[in-house]
Design a protein with these regions (language model features):
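N-terminal secretory signal peptides and thylakoid transit peptides that target proteins
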Residues: 1-13
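C-terminal segment of N-terminal export signals and the immediately downstream linker at the start
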Residues: 21-73
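Active-site beta->alpha N-cap acidic-glycine motif
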Residues: 59-170, 174, 184-185, 226, ...
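Catalytic grooves of carbohydrate-active enzymes
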Residues: 77, 83-87, 297-349
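Acidic (Asp/Glu)-rich catalytic clusters
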Residues: 93-100, 116-136, 259-260, 276-280, ...
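His/Asp/Glu-enriched short active-site or ligand-binding loop at hydrolase and phosphoryl-transfer sites
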Residues: 107, 138-142, 250-251, 255-301, ...
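Interface-prone segments of viral and bacterial extracellular assemblies
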Residues: 149-154, 166-169, 207-214, 220, ...
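Small/polar beta-strand repeat architecture
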Residues: 184-222
């Protein structure tokens, strides 16, 4: 696609009354949980070993002579696609290329290395050389933020009742179970659900009681190691990493501090919105708007783009190309709506560079 510098099309009116937030889990998210449980993916190399290097490099896409990428555009919008499934290449990249506009892939390199339904490094290198951005999404889609307990945990228990069992996805992962009075360490043995709700199984019984007001999370040092490893692998493949997207939108607790300390931009620091006011903007505390068909109507998309054009904001949209609810038609419609509202479709790296010029 070799990047455009200015994107300007005729304006169009848009419907109003967008619903700017969607909560709850879609059927596709539930299906992905099932695929993750079934996947043969038992590697345990989060111990600091360096990933092997491979040749490859990403072309520079900065505008020449420092000119603005906005020109006559009314604003900026960043398209973010999560998880790095193969559909990022076969669907999103193909459609974006037709319009000569970029997107950003939030990549999970641990899945890219091992699973055929994910991008391979050559494909992602091709995309970045053609103007796409690459963001970190953890090595194997780990939930980083704390999750509340659904009941008290007692010394001797080998199972935690939790509001969501995200932390139980990868056997052997370390955990911290804590409340206002203290904390205790644990190790993941698995996860599941029954008539009482979701749970995380532990390799060994807990050594201390934890109140039902408590939480479970990964240790801070482990979170830092996972992020370092994620970026190291992507960079070893010749990719430039700009920014972060939280898996499952789980950002609460110590993870927030770790992520904001490491990355210069976070696309989903909080739920909802997607219009990030430029005045006083902290790029590590941004929000985005999902555009899958079960989360937004065409009127919602148009209203979102209209607001992005009318107000002084950086707009961010998010989507999952592996979901049935993100159709080719919806990708096209969202791109066309942005262009019809005279918005420049940019990568996160380009958006940050533009912010520095202001």
């Amino acid at each position: 696609m070799r990047r455009r510098r200015v994107l300007v099309l005729g304006g169009a009116s848009a419907a109003s009354g967008a619903a700017y937030w969607f909560s709850g889990r879609s059927s596709e998210e539930l299906a992905r949980d099932e695929r993750d449980r079934e996947a043969v993916d038992t590697e345990r190399d989060d111990d600091g070993s360096e990933p092997s290097d491979e040749d490859g490099s990403a072309d520079e896409t900065e505008p020449e002579n420092g000119e603005s990428i906005l020109a006559d555009s009314k604003g900026m919008v960043v398209f973010t696609y999560d998880d790095s499934p193969i559909e990022d290449y076969t669907l999103a990249y193909e459609v974006h290329s037709e319009y000569d506009v970029p997107g950003c892939t939030a990549a999970c390199p641990g899945y890219m290395k091992r699973r055929d339904d994910y991008l391979d490094p050559d494909q992602l290198r091709e995309m970045q050389a053609d103007g796409w951005g690459v963001m970190s999404h953890t090595y194997r889609h780990r939930s980083l933020g704390r999750i509340g307990l659904a009941g008290p945990a007692h010394a001797g228990d080998d199972r935690l009742s939790v509001e969501a069992n995200r932390h139980g996805a990868i056997e052997g992962d370390p955990l911290v179970v804590f409340d206002d009075e203290g904390e205790t360490a644990a190790t993941v043995a698995g996860r599941g659900s029954d008539s009482s709700g979701q749970y995380v199984e532990l390799e060994a019984p807990l050594s201390e009681d934890v109140d039902e007001s408590g939480y479970v999370r990964h240790p801070e040092s482990f979170i830092r190691d996972v992020l370092r490893k994620t970026d190291a692998q992507l960079e070893a493949w010749g990719l430039d990493v700009t920014g972060f997207v939280y898996p499952y939108g789980r950002y609460h607790g110590v993870a927030e501090e770790v992520v904001r300390d490491r990355y210069e931009a976070v696309a989903n620091h909080r739920y909802g919105g997607g219009h990030n006011e430029l005045e006083g903007l902290d790029p590590t505390a941004m929000r985005r708007r999902y555009v899958e068909t079960d989360r937004a109507t065409e009127d919602d998309v148009d209203a979102f783009m209209e607001t992005a054009a009318d107000e002084d904001v950086l707009a961010i949209v998010g989507a999952h190309t592996q979901y049935d609810t993100l159709t080719e038609q919806r990708v096209r419609y969202t791109i066309e709506s942005a262009l019809e509202h005279d918005l420049a479709i940019v990568t996160m790296e380009e958006a940050l560079a533009e912010l520095e010029r202001r």
